Curated annotation (Swiss-Prot):
UniProt-recorded name of the protein: Heat shock protein 104
Source taxonomy: Eukaryota, Fungi, Dikarya, Ascomycota, Taphrinomycotina
Quaternary context: Homohexamer, forming a ring with a central pore.
Biological role: Required, in concert with Hsp40 and Hsp70 and small Hsps, for the dissociation, resolubilization and refolding of aggregates of damaged proteins after heat or other environmental stresses. Extracts proteins from aggregates by unfolding and threading them in an ATP-dependent process through the axial channel of the protein hexamer, after which they can be refolded by components of the Hsp70/Hsp40 chaperone system.
Family: Belongs to the ClpA/ClpB family.
Length: 905
């Protein structure tokens, strides 16, 4: 046997056969073992070669496999198994016959199909094939059909057997079986593809467009037209096969294997009796595929000769970027294809596409998708999912919304789940109490049984209602699925000219089922209307199976973080009271708070310009008046976290070249792939507050970059990607003109007089360019803080200290007397420095003494710290005597109320 030249797969088949014989304890290797090894060939793609041949010969492949396994089990076995398995006379004869066949066919090696071809010369295998319904003549024809005209001239020649079935997907067959989604629109692109395919030379179109615009669907639309005979005569009998480049490359371990596979595919295409059009999705994968860097040819070079001779009809599909990167570099390959540009459809076209796909998604998810949901999906995808393309983004929205409704519907309703949990707990309690003998347990047992009966009585109607709604929904879902199948059968019958079946389905089966679906939908609508009319607790439907605009809004909000959901009552109240919420944190700046609140309300009410940021502000004023604090308060209001904002400190962008840190380094520079600090954060969180702190510190070139952000709500990164900023609030802070605001030039209500305001504005105009200022929504000048404002800020700061103690797990309450608050406000008031000195005063006069008292044991957990005024100074009262460790000798009087003035002088 060692003298026979086997291919790699044939040698592995014999090795597997020996292993099978050894595992069953058989002393000899019989043809049954070889057949079993061929049926369990783990290296084959999909079905095994033997199973494919049996099926092609008209036999029952599954029955043949069962017969081989049954015969294998009945062979005599040894225990313990023999150390060495010998070749039976029947197997030796089978190998000799295979060797003779190899010589007859002038092959260089014995392959798997040689083994299979001589199965009919073995009595045992011949009888098994006969049981499976295979005749010797049909079997021989099937073997030759799989082999084709190929010659076994290499050890891996079997890779090319039945290559089209292994490495391609028949799109025309999928379309015939109704397994492809309908293609709506794209008529111009499909017609252009047909025209290119009908050319005499260069009849290979390549579909180029952005990801998600529907390039693959054009090929599917062409497959649909071919089976509907809606193409010219030269394409009417064609098969459209999609080439799987991944399967071609996968498993090609040695040099030459990949080339062998693709040559087999091309040869089968060329020799096929039916004209074949090859569709290559992601065509750029052909460039370099299979070369392996060892001098091997890539797939593109193997395709070139057939493309040049016009013997191969090929449709390619790739993106603009990948076409430029890979295909344009190979001019010889590029010129053999004719470009067809696939543009992104409009919103109206996308809605039409969604309407065409609606039925497929309804059947798949078992839900009803409203037309308003489709319109909402198209508009929201276009507006908010700017990094993706229609119609793919809109289809994904509808798909996920339908999936969310389906998951909710197939889960048990919360009210029913809670009742059943309660009932289970009561039953467990009853079983435990039944073992007890005391009077208290007996009383509790009686009460538990009564409560269990009440819960069971309450659960029963809800469960019945749930089961009724579920069965009604299931029946409707099954009817829609059945209708989809009948429509596919009717179309197939028309194509096969089976007009009797087509007429039965078209005029009897389908109309009857449509009437049934209409009746079920009517019953459901009637039940829902009755529930709404009754408006009693528990009368509303338990199961929701309709996808509406609200469900689409929720998916968009989940994906982007942008609150596009319908305004709820609680949120409406929050937005209407926004000034009150912000004013509690930002004291004395009513004008700024009102401007910010109005911008957010405009956006959530849908009245803001969709082509600009939500709002852009320039906050000007003295240091410490609350410019940055208002930004934090806004972020806290919108996202419940004051740190949930994009903060750019412009003092870090004082050089010209630092603009690359903002938007990313240009191509060729170090850090190009990393992206910019602004653009990358904005891509991840499109709905955010962007703070440019101390804007006047930045270089003028950096401010120039912000012009497009303020005007069109977009910014182009260093990588050429357009980043959307239309859902961001842009806030810039500046101290320009602060020197005019430090003097006492304001009215009693804290507002700045017109003269001072004009002086500040002149200072701003003198620094910033007109085109920059002209793009800002509102310039807000912050007032100088008054003493009454400082008094209110004291209370806020004390509350912050209280929260800090709680976060550090200190249960100490702080009580500050009104006199102490007034004294702290007086000591912390500074017109030039705003509220920041107050923080230092509170730290020196309240927090430092408290820290000493806590460490000294004079102030303990779950106690109150009393802050009062004694002898004109702030004093924190101790609650206990000092520990006898000398700590009480610290001089508290050394901390006086002049510390603020000393620090600022």
């Amino acid at each position: 046997m060692a003298d026979y030249p086997f291919t790699d797969k044939a040698a592995k088949t014999l090795s597997d056969a020996y292993s099978i014989a050894q595992s069953y304890g058989h002393s000899q290797l019989t043809p049954i073992h070889i057949a079993a090894a061929l049926l369990s060939d783990s290296d084959s793609n999909g079905t095994t070669l033997l199973r494919t041949i049996v099926d092609k010969a008209g036999g029952d492949g599954q029955k043949f496999e069962r017969s081989v396994t049954s015969r294998l089990v009945r062979l005599p076995a040894q225990d313990p198994p023999p150390e060495q398995v010998t070749l039976s006379p029947e197997s030796a004869k089978l190998l000799r016959n295979a060797h003779e066949l190899q010589k007859t066919q002038k092959d260089s090696y014995i392959a798997q199909d040689h083994f299979i071809a001589v199965f009919t010369k073995d009595d045992t295998l011949k009888s098994l094939l006969a049981e499976a319904g295979v005749t010797p003549k049909a079997f021989e024809f099937a073997v030759n059909n799989v082999r084709g005209n190929k010659r076994i001239d290499s050890k891996n020649a079997e890779e090319g057997f039945d290559a089209l079935n292994k490495f391609t997907v028949d799109l025309t067959e999928l379309a015939r079986n109704g397994q492809l989604d309908p293609v709506i629109g794209r008529e111009d692109e499909i017609r252009r593809t047909i025209r290119v395919l009908s050319r005499r030379t260069k009849n290979n179109p390549v579909l180029i467009g952005e990801p998600g615009v529907g390039k693959t669907s054009i090929a599917e639309g062409l497959a649909r037209r071919i089976i509907d005979d809606d193409v010219p005569a030269n394409l009417s009998n064609c098969k459209l096969l999609s080439l799987d480049v991944g399967s071609l490359v996968a498993g090609s371990k040695f040099r030459g294997e990949f080339e062998e596979r693709i040559k087999s595919v091309l040869k089968e295409v060329e020799e096929s009796e039916t004209p074949i059009i090859l569709f290559v999705d992601e065509m750029h994968l052909l460039m370099g595929a299979g070369s392996g860097g060892e001098g091997g040819m890539d797939a593109a070079n193997l395709l070139k000769p057939m493309l040049a001779r016009g013997k191969l009809h090929c449709i390619g599909a790739t993106t603009l970027a990948e076409y430029k990167k890979y295909i344009e570099k190979d001019a010889a390959f590029e010129r053999r294809f004719q470009i067809i540009l696939v543009k992104e459809p409009s919103i109206e076209d996308t809605i039409s596409i969604l309407r065409g796909l609606k039925e497929k998604y309804e059947v798949h998810h078992g839900v009803t998708i409203s037309d308003r949901a489709l319109v909402t999906a198209a508009h929201l995808a276009s507006r908010y999912l700017t990094s993706r393309r229609l119609p793919d983004s809109a289809i994904d929205l509808v798909d996920e919304a339908a999936a969310a409704v389906r998951v909710t519907r197939e889960s048990q309703p919360e009210v029913l789940d809670n009742l059943e949990r309660k009932l289970r707990q009561l039953r467990v309690e009853i079983r435990a109490l039944e073992r007890e003998k005391d009077e208290a347990s007996k009383e509790r047992l009686k009460a538990a049984r009564k409560e269990a009966e009440q819960v069971e009585e309450e659960t029963r109607p809800i469960r019945e209602k749930y089961e009724l709604e579920k069965s009604r929904g299931s029946e409707l879902q099954d009817a829609k699925r059945r209708l989809d199948e009948l429509k596919a059968k009717a179309e197939d019958a028309e194509r096969r000219n089976d007009f009797t079946l087509a007429a039965d389905l078209k005029y009897y089966g389908i109309p009857d089922l449509q009437k049934r679906i209409e009746y079920l939908e009517q019953q459901k609508r009637k039940a829902d209307a009755e529930a709404i009319a009754n408006a009693q607790p528990g009368s509303e439907p338990l199961l929701i199976d309709v996808v509406g605009p609200d469900q689409i809004n929720e998916i968009v909000a989940r994906w982007t973080g942008i609150p596009v959901t319908r305004l709820k009552t609680t949120e409406k109240e929050r937005l209407l009271n926004m000034e009150k919420v912000l004013s509690k944190q930002v004291i004395g700046q009513n004008e700024a708070v009102t401007a910010v609140a109005n911008a957010i309300r405009l956006s959530r009410a849908g009245l803001s310009d969709p082509n600009q940021p939500i709002a852009s502000f320039l906050f000007c004023g003295p240091s410490g008046t609350g410019k940055t604090l208002l930004t934090k308060a806004l972020a806290s209001f919108m996202f419940d976290d004051e740190n949930a904002m994009i903060r750019i400190d412009m003092s870090e962008y004082m050089e010209k070249h630092s603009v690359s840190r903002l938007i990313g380094a240009p191509p060729g520079y170090v850090g190009h792939e990393a992206g910019g600090q602004l653009t990358e954060q904005l891509r991840r969180r499109p709905y955010s507050v962007i703070l440019f702190d101390e804007i006047e510190k930045a270089a003028p070139e950096v401010l120039t970059v912000l012009l497009q952000v303020l005007d069109d709500g977009r910014i182009t990164s260093g990588q050429g990607q357009v980043v959307d900023a239309k859902n961001a609030v842009i806030i810039m802070t500046s101290n320009l003109g602060a020197e005019y605001l430090t003097t006492d030039n304001e009215s009693d209500d804290g507002k700045i007089d017109s003269t001072t305001r004009e002086m500040v504005m002149n200072s701003i105009r003198g620094f910033f360019r007109p085109e920059f200022l002209n793009r800002i929504s509102s310039i807000v000048i912050f007032n100088r803080l008054r003493r009454v404002d400082i008094r209110n800020i004291v209370e806020n700061r004390i509350l912050e200290v209280q929260k800090r103690l709680q976060s550090n797990h200190r249960s100490i309450k702080i009580e500050v007397s009104d006199e102490a608050k007034d004294l702290l406000g007086s000591a912390g008031y500074s017109p030039a420095y705003g509220a920041r000195p107050l923080n230092r005063v509170i730290q020196n006069q309240v927090l430092n003494p408290m820290a000493v008292l806590i460490l000294n044991g004079q102030l303990r957990d779950k106690e109150t710290a009393h802050v009062v005024v004694q002898n004109g100074k702030i004093f924190v009262k101790p609650n206990h005597e000092a520990n006898a460790n000398g700590s009480a000798d610290i001089d508290m009087d050394g901390i006086d109320d002049d510390v603020n003035d000393e620090e600022l002088e």
